[in-house]
């Protein structure tokens, strides 16, 4: 399972993590990256994510870590309450959500991540980190142009 954290201002990947897929790995990796990014910080962060992150435990852990969850809501039930969805920033995050997945799509189509030939978490993790760095380098000319 591959995860990455991204800066919303410029869309560059700032952190990666590869874990064993077990149904909870993405959420655990996201929490680990948040705690590594700002350990003990009281500055409010925002996390934008897809529907797979909409579960009560994950949202509770985010709120305890001073992170606002801008997670896409599940249709039948959602852990995201009305105070979050009514905020104008939530609507903006939902529109920008597509940008989160673009580097992962690039890694699978242009980069070598569609079917890796490596085995082991460390090796695949190194390949994934290198691929995300290449994705950032590919985006830089467009960012510098304006």
Task: State where each predicted segment sits.
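Anion-binding and metal-coordination hotspots
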Residues: 1-146
